[in-house]
């Protein structure tokens, strides 16, 4: 029975990714890139500035008597900053996809898959800009924080409440359940290989820690992410840079191999070119989530004076995830010279790093995947919770969702790798299609906001948005 279900999942996943998703994803990314006049390249400097030097947003700047995203604790005002929203999204992005996903793409699609991951990031960051800007535009005011995401711009922007519910359900299934089972599965495999710990035992520990964090709400999620994500990223990057530096003479050959394999310039690669493209884009999307509709859930929470600010920051997150972290994993695997067909997933990354730094490689990757994947579990959980609240904002509903997430974390620890990935691939495909339709239809609004932002910057102002600038939809913009 399980084998039959697994075969159905694999066949469905192959069909969606071979004939539908890749074409739609790339076409939309190119469309947004042209529509925004290459915003992801023109404003890289502004992205970095916004992240490193966030504006101090005052109530007057956003035209409110008080910031509705603020939380009064002991008389003090708190809010979710742009940086915290960035790292909550990055916590979800930087996870299994960066270590295990890259390895899977290379083992199945060859080194050329890395090139197509880069292509998706470079073009897809425009999609990330559009979706996160729209999420900021249509965000809502809660009792303790702003909230929003694709479900909200589908309902209030398109006037399609049913589409918002469909997206919310897919979001809950994809991030709360499917992705978290993959993250759990990868952690358990890594720790079994490194320390001999049984997956079921590790699953229990992982589930307990997940419950501890998620019952603390968005502010605990944001605090955890803003503490853990920068540290783990820096540590991993330092090791990766060290490995690449040690093998610097091999780097030109690796880059040539990636490009040759990407376009089938040699006989061996030519026969599997389609697989190379599919694996690169599939695993690239799993990792950077550009256009998938996930990061907007975090982007909507931030307190900013203009929607474009969070759109730019989330576009930077795509670059950080794929061009930096994923590339590091790819270079570690390819410069090591290990047989990429001998193992799969996280075990390939472990084998490559062990080859380079010795026996400490296995436990190092196990610890890093714990931090990467566990931070993703927490970020994924929050995305799902936002959409649970969209469907029915009740304490019971959120409580049941939290228990269901914990159950899927435990389930992921003991199911097969193929089953976990196939399930995630299908739900990811459906979710992405739903979101892309919405942001294509609403993209002109994001472009208008970008033009307004640029005009204010030219005038030497700190860009501030007011719904009076968009009178046709002003009644839909609750937070502005």
Where is each model-derived feature located?
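N-terminal alpha-helical transmembrane segments of multi-pass membrane transport
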Residues: 1-89, 96, 107-112, 441-480
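Transmembrane helix-loop junctions in multi-pass membrane proteins
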Residues: 4-5, 35-40, 97-102, 176-187, ...
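Extracellular loop-to-transmembrane helix junctions
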Residues: 13-53, 105-144, 320-326, 362, ...
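Alpha-helical membrane segments and immediately flanking helix-loop junctions
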Residues: 61-106, 134-137, 143-151, 155, ...
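Extracellular/periplasmic helix-exit of transmembrane alpha-helices
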Residues: 129-139, 143, 239-257, 265, ...
């Amino acid at each position: 029975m399980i084998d039959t279900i697994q075969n159905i999942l694999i066949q469905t996943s192959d069909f969606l990714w071979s004939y539908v998703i890749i074409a739609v994803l790339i076409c939309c990314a190119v469309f947004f890139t042209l529509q925004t006049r290459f915003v992801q390249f023109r404003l890289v400097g502004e992205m970095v500035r916004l992240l490193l030097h966030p504006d101090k947003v005052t109530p007057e700047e956003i035209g409110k008597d008080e910031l509705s995203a603020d939380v009064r604790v002991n008389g003090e005002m708190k809010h979710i900053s742009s940086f915290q929203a960035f790292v909550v999204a990055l916590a979800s992005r930087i996870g299994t996809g960066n270590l295990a996903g890259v390895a899977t793409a290379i083992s199945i699609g060859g080194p050329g898959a890395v090139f197509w991951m880069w292509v998706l990031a470079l073009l897809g960051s425009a999609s990330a800009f559009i979706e996160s800007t729209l999420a900021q535009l249509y965000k809502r005011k809660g009792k303790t924080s702003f909230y929003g995401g694709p479900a909200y711009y589908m309902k209030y922007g398109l006037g399609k409440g049913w589409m918002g519910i469909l997206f919310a359900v897919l979001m809950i299934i994809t991030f709360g359940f499917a992705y978290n089972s993959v993250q759990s599965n990868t952690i358990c495999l890594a720790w079994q290989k490194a320390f001999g710990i049984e997956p079921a035992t590790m699953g229990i520990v992982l589930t307990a820690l997940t419950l501890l964090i998620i019952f603390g709400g968005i502010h605990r999620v944001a605090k955890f992410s803003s503490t853990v994500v920068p540290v783990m990223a820096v540590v991993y990057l330092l090791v990766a840079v060290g490995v690449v530096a040690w093998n610097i003479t091999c780097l030109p050959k690796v880059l040539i191999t990636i490009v040759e394999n990407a376009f089938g310039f040699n006989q061996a690669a030519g026969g599997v070119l389609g697989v190379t493209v599919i694996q690169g884009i599939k695993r690239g999307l799993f990792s950077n989530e550009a256009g998938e509709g996930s990061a907007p859930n975090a982007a909507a929470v931030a307190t900013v004076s203009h929607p474009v600010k969070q759109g730019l920051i989330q576009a930077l997150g795509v670059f950080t995830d794929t061009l930096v972290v994923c590339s590091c994993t790819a270079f570690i695997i390819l410069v090591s010279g290990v047989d990429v067909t001998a193992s799969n997933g996280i075990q390939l990354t472990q084998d490559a790093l062990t080859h380079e730094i010795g026996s400490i490689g296995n436990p190092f990757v196990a610890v890093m995947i714990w931090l990467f994947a566990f931070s993703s579990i927490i970020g994924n959980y929050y995305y799902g919770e936002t959409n649970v609240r969209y469907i029915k904002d009740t304490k019971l509903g959120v409580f049941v969702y939290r228990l269901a997430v914990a159950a899927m974390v435990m389930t992921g620890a003991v199911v097969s790798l193929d089953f976990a990935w196939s399930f995630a691939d299908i739900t990811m495909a459906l979710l992405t299609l739903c979101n892309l339709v919405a942001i294509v239809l609403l993209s002109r609004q994001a472009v208008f906001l970008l033009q307004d932002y640029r005009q204010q910057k030219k005038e030497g102002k700190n860009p501030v948005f007011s719904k009076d600038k968009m009178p046709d939809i002003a009644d839909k913009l609750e937070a502005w």
